Every structure is written in structure tokens, then in C-alpha cells.
Amino acid sequence: MPVVESDEKVDDTAKDLSSLGLSDKETARGEEKEEKGTVAAPSAPTVDTVQPTTGPSWPATAPDHPLSKFYDIFEDVIKSAEHNEVYGILLTKENPFQTKLILQKFLRANQNDLDKAKQQLLETLKWRKEFDPVKATGEKFDKTRFGGLGYVLEVQGVPESKNEKDVVTFNIYGAVKDKKATFGDLEGFLRWRVGLMEKSVQKLNLASATTPVPNYGEGPDPYQGFQIHDYLQVSFLRQDPAVKAATSKTIEVLGRYYPETLSRKFFVNVPVIMGWMYTAAKLIVAKETAKKFAVLSYGNQLAGELGVDIPAVYGGTKEDLESVAEGMSLE
């Protein structure tokens, strides 16, 4: 069985690059889905509020299978957390397919360790109850702080992908005009960044999913997205404390509370010397982890990885991100 590491470990591997500060002499770029059918987060436990429905069926699993065991006890986790929503999906026995899909993601992220998966689900539910990321997707943010920093784009024709469409999130670091304004208010930055992440997850269409997520080690999860970190016009010479703090906290939050949502992560427009460093780093991490991130020195190389259904600046055929992609609401 191949070794598959969690998104949290991938983020740890890439953290040195993501957390490098931005020079005071240059502009910086800010850090790393709304879909019909998703359900807004409930304000209180609603384990029994969803009416039984007919829908897709999950393949039968043996009583001792980790997913069977998790499904038997997840309601206890919900009661403890006093919340039952993940990615806009209500976890209930009346919604077995989508519930098992979410539980399977937590199992895969923890290599089928039920205790660890249970703990991560509990922490995620508590965090979602407090932070309310679904609400964040519809909030308005200051255009002067976050304009041009992040976009979500649906693309077709990704090489080797079996999906009709894939979801790509772009983090445009060079769009930052004022580092202190963008990153200084950490909580404000997190609401923007988590809102963007939640928006991208909604685009995965989990509420209408009909294909089961494979067991850990038995194939790829089809419900994952790509993350792009564009460092054009960004200096790696200095570390800005505010940028470093915001990046570190973002990695912590997304790595812990969004398991199995990352297919691959690309760092583009990275200076050649930094590319060499990451090439060396990939030699000392697990093979499956190394597959999840790539460093590209030039933006137009991205089309070789994701196909041509991306903006021309990345080697594709589409117009610029502002024209073809979706960002957060700004005012």
C-alpha cells in the first residue's frame, strides 16, 4: 500500500517558501466553492432535521472497515462539537452518501487511523461553528486590502485528470499594495483567505457528488482542487513579520481544517535559486508528498501542468483572472 501523506504535511514541506517575507522595496502578493446545492452552516446541532432522501449509494463496507466504524460513531462527535456542518454538507444518517464522503476524507488524511480522524473532525466542527466559513464566502472585503489577491477558476482539460472540470485557486502575492494593511489585521486576513478557500471547496460540488471517494491507498480523491501561488515581482530577500505571521496561521488553519481538499500546489514565478532549493527538498520527503507540490520559475510553464484552459499569462488561452475567474466580494 503506498504511503499517502496529509495536506497538512504537504503544507509543512512547502512552508519555508510560503512564509518567506516580502521586501519593503517591492510590492507583495497575499497568501494560499459558492455552489448550488450546498447548505448554509446551522446555528445549532441539527442531527435530525434533514428528511430522509433517495440518492447515490456508497459501496458496502465490512463492519470492521474504518469507514463503517466512523459512520457508527460520528453522531457522538457531532453532539460533542454541537455542530454538524462541513463544507456546507450536513452530517446526518439521513444523508449517508455525502456524510460518508466527508468522513472518508478525514480517514484518508489520517491514513485510516480512526482515533486521529475522529479528533480532527471534532476540532474541525468546533472551528467551523466558531469561525463560520460558509458565512465568510458571502462577506464583503476592503478592495484596497484584498483587490486582485485571490481568484477561483474552473478549468477543463487538466492532463491526467478524470474530472470534466477542475477547480484552481490562484493566490497573487504581487497584488498587495500595502503589506501592513493586508496582513497586519490577522483576523481580517484570515476571514478573507478562509472565505476564498471555502468558495473553492464549494466549487467541488460535494453536495451533488455521486462518485465515492476511494479507500485510503486505493486511488485518488476526485474531489480536490489545485492551489497556485504566484510570486511575480516578489522579493525573497527579507522576511516581513506580518506576512510571515499571516502565512503561518493560514497554513495551520487550512492544513488542519480542510483535509483532502488539495490535489497539487504550484509555486510559480519563483526565482531559479529558490527552485533549486525545492528540487533538493523533494529528494528528502516522501514520494507522495513530493508529487503534491511543484516549483515553476516562469508563469507560462503552468499550462504544461494544468492545460491551456487558464489565462494566457500562465501559458493558456483564456483572458486575465479578473475577467474569467471568481474572487471575493469587494467594496
Swiss-Prot record:
Membrane topology: Peripheral membrane protein
GO process terms (BP): Golgi to plasma membrane protein transport; regulation of exocytosis
Subcellular localization, as worded in the UniProt entry: Cytoplasm; Endoplasmic reticulum membrane; Microsome membrane
Main location: cytoplasm
InterPro entries linked to this entry: CRAL-TRIO_dom, CRAL-TRIO_dom_sf, CRAL/TRIO_N_dom, CRAL/TRIO_N_dom_sf, Sfh5
Family annotation (Pfam families): CRAL_TRIO (PF00650), CRAL_TRIO_N (PF03765)
Compositionally biased spans, kind Polar residues: 46-56
Cofactor: heme b
Gene3D superfamilies: CRAL-TRIO lipid binding domain
GO CC annotation terms, alphabetical: cortical endoplasmic reticulum; cytosol; endoplasmic reticulum membrane; plasma membrane
Stated role: Non-classical phosphatidylinositol (PtdIns) transfer protein (PITP), which exhibits PtdIns-binding/transfer activity in the absence of detectable PtdCho-binding/transfer activity. Regulates PtdIns(4,5)P2 homeostasis at the plasma membrane. Heme-binding protein that may play a role in organic oxidant-induced stress responses.
Protein name: Phosphatidylinositol transfer protein SFH5
Organism: Phaeosphaeria nodorum (strain SN15 / ATCC MYA-4574 / FGSC 10173)
Phylogenetic lineage: Eukaryota, Fungi, Dikarya, Ascomycota, Pezizomycotina
Gene designation: SFH5
